Design a protein with these regions (language model features):
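Active-site proximal beta-strand in glycosyltransferases
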Residues: 15-18, 23, 28-49, 69
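Nucleotide-activated donor-binding/catalytic signature segment of Leloir-type glycosyltransferases, i.e.
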Residues: 145-167
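Acidic donor-binding loop of glycosyltransferase active sites
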Residues: 173-184, 197
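Membrane-proximal helix-turn-helix segments that form the acceptor-binding/catalytic region
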Residues: 33, 46-68, 75
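Charged catalytic cores and adjacent phosphate/nucleic-acid-binding surfaces used
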Residues: 259-299, 304, 317-357, 361, ...
Length: 493
């Protein structure tokens, strides 16, 4: 089943995949974590949020879901605590035309659930005391038990099947009162309200309080009708039409964040230019954790055949300026950049910068500072969960401001981190970048992009449309050991 679902999702070319109740092991969870389409998750119950159990898996799930919805404020609050994010409350949905009010009988409809046996017995006692009333016990699932009905009440107490909407509508349209079972189906109570029944909730209440409330409503027609009118008004706001409109708004909003589909084939605006290999992420000795000089870096890049490099030191810009100056008489393209540490949302690289950007600003402020210089926003290693990264809310909120997403970083410990970035870039049709994140010469070029030669930021973005990601990984342990040795030597000096 799982394999068939994954195959269908891969071949379907869907714009949006919408899963319901993914907080339990289900095909919805599989679909949302497998597809490359835009994803929406709807939570229907605060009691169905236990999966996945580990924080790491919940974070991965959250990163793959683009919009979180809930059908009640209670469920939204519980899901937000579990999955960390803003949830939109949408209607549960009810067919107001099918579940429309009709002529009422003196009948109490009670949801029949194992957890509600006490409610069933209590309502049976009330019907016995009020001879003009009938009781209908409605089951929407196969019965695992059968309540005992006293012989003297069998003309007024009936068990009714409510497996289909039509069956439930017939029962609820005639009922004057509906009593929900503790932990029962929220939709059934909504259908009862739409059908004009006065609804009595039992969840979290003492049985004697419920019995007292129902007893009062049986003898007070005006109170019962007022309760029914209030419920009907609420049910009309929860219609399927309203739900469809809200979901359409969510889908359109998500689709609006995605870049326009680029044409394939011969669409190469820089087709007359030569191909070069460009490493878009590396460091010099201006970074606190690197001892490679800009001069050595340029010589090595030339020696291994790179056509371009981006100097992206940590929170400093001097190394990039030095490299640009040293490269003036070389054919090697040097992009001046900086890897800027935000306050608490990871790092953002600015490419084609003119001046240094201070660390410690918010993600939004950092992106704005890059934009003010006419720079390009390049997001490095966005899913490297072993380091500080943007949380899913920040990533989704600012996706339209990301010019290039790094889908391959040669220094990441796990391939899955790069795979996650590639999935995200494909979903939103972002331009893809790659870099070595080299801190030693031996790492330079282990991640790069094959692209057309460019001369300015605009041509750089045009060239990335037809670029190819190059993966040339070397042992991370080997590269890390070289970095540590170089740092120790620097300290000894």
């Amino acid at each position: 089943m799982r394999a068939n679902l994954k195959l269908a999702l891969a071949r379907g070319d869907f714009d949006v995949v919408h899963g319901f109740e993914p907080g339990v092991p289900s095909l919805s969870y599989v679909a949302l974590t497998t597809t490359d389409a835009l994803t929406v998750a709807t939570f229907l119950s605060a009691a169905r949020l236990g999966y996945p159990p580990s924080r790491a898996r919940r974070d991965r799930f959250r990163a793959r879901v683009d919009a979180l919805l809930a059908t009640s404020a209670e469920t939204a609050q519980a899901a937000a605590e579990r999955f960390r994010g803003d949830l939109t409350v949408v209607p549960l949905g009810v067919d107001n035309a099918l579940f429309r009010p009709a002529e009422k009988r003196r009948c109490i409809a009670v949801e029949l659930e194992p957890a509600g046996r006490g409610v069933t017995r209590s309502m049976t006692r009330l019907v016995e005391q009020n001879e003009q009333w009938e009781l209908e016990l409605v089951h929407t699932k196969p019965l695992g038990f059968r309540p005992s009905i006293p012989r003297r009440l069998r003309q007024r107490v009936h068990i009714r099947r409510g497996r289909t909407q039509a069956q439930r509508a017939e029962i609820l349209r005639a009922a004057s009162l509906f009593v929900a079972a503790p932990g029962g189906e929220e939709r059934l109570a909504l259908e009862a309200a739409s059908a004009g029944a006065a609804v009595v909730e039992t969840r979290g209440r003492r049985l004697r309080d419920v019995e007292s409330e129902v007893s009062g409503l049986l003898g007070d027609d005006a109170a019962r009708e007022a309760r029914a009118a209030e419920g009907l008004s609420h049910a009309q706001d929860e219609s399927f039409d309203r739900l469809a409109a809200d979901l359409d708004e969510v889908y359109v909003r998500l689709a609006g964040k995605r870049r326009a589909r680029r044409s394939s084939g011969s669409d190469d605006p820089l087709g007359g230019r030569d191909w070069i290999v460009v490493d878009l992420h590396m460091h010099t000795d201006w970074s606190h954790d690197c001892s490679t000089t800009a001069s050595d870096l340029l010589d090595h890049a030339d020696a291994i055949g790179l056509g371009g490099i981006a100097i992206t030191d940590h929170n400093v810009f001097g190394g990039a300026l030095e490299a640009v100056e040293l490269a003036r008489n070389r054919r090697l393209v040097v992009i001046p950049g900086e890897e800027v540490k935000t306050d608490d949302q990871g790092e953002v690289i600015g490419l084609f910068l003119r001046e240094e950007i201070p660390r410690g600003m918010s993600f939004s402020e950092t992106v704005g500072a890059i934009r003010e210089q006419g720079g390009i926003v390049y997001l490095p290693h966005p899913f490297d969960r072993l380091h500080a990264i943007p949380d899913p809310e920040t990533l989704h909120r600012h996706v339209h401001e990301i010019d290039v997403l790094e889908v391959f970083n040669a220094r990441l410990l796990r391939d899955s981190f790069n795979d996650e970035a590639l999935r995200f870039a494909r979903k939103y049709r972002l331009l893809q970048g790659a870099g070595s994140d080299a801190h030693v010469l031996q790492g330079v070029g282990t991640g790069a992009v094959r692209m057309r030669r460019f001369h300015d930021p605009e041509e750089f973005l045009l060239s990335l449309r037809t670029a190819e990601i190059l993966r040339r990984p070397k042992s991370l342990a080997y590269l890390q050991s070289l970095k540590w040795v170089a740092q120790v030597k620097e300290k000894v000096r």
